[in-house]
From Swiss-Prot:
It comes from Sorangium cellulosum (strain So ce56). This is Large ribosomal subunit protein bL21. It holds the Pfam family Ribosomal_L21p. GO terms for cellular component: cytoplasm; ribonucleoprotein complex; ribosome. This protein binds to 23S rRNA in the presence of protein L20. It comes from the Bacteria. GO terms for biological process: translation. InterPro entries: bL21-like, bL21-like_sf, Ribosomal_bL21, Ribosomal_bL21_CS. Keywords: Ribonucleoprotein, Ribosomal protein, RNA-binding, rRNA-binding. GO terms for molecular function: rRNA binding; structural constituent of ribosome. HAMAP family: Ribosomal_bL21 (MF_01363).
Length: 102
């Protein structure tokens, strides 16, 4: 059985036991989270939401907090000696899907 969930402005196809990296969620390692925004539940008898599947939820456990690779943002104006260099590391949360209820 699999499901499509929505979190952090993105959609993810998840299955039980799968490890996943999503946009940052508040919580520490070992905390339980529940996703109620389930768009689709697939399997023997798939359920498609309009837009959400009523009564469906996905349970997960936070396995860690992490940050992505650093990107460099560089702005400049030609001939004006204007330069700004900035770095950014996006925070992520690592999850393990523990259950899907439909």
């Amino acid at each position: 059985m699999y499901a499509v969930i929505k979190t952090g402005g993105k959609q993810y196809r998840v299955a039980e036991g799968q490890k996943l990296r999503v946009e940052k969620l508040v919580g520490n390692a070992g905390d339980k989270v529940t996703f109620s925004e389930v768009l689709l539940v697939g399997g023997d008898s798939p359920k498609i939401g309009k837009p959400l599947v009523s009564g469906a939820s996905v349970a997960a456990e936070i396995t860690g907090q992490d940050r992505g690779k650093k990107i460099v943002v560089f702005k400049f104006r030609r001939r004006k000696n204007y330069r700004r260099k900035n770095g950014h590391r996006q925070p992520y949360t690592e999850l393990k899907i523990t259950g899907i209820t439909a």
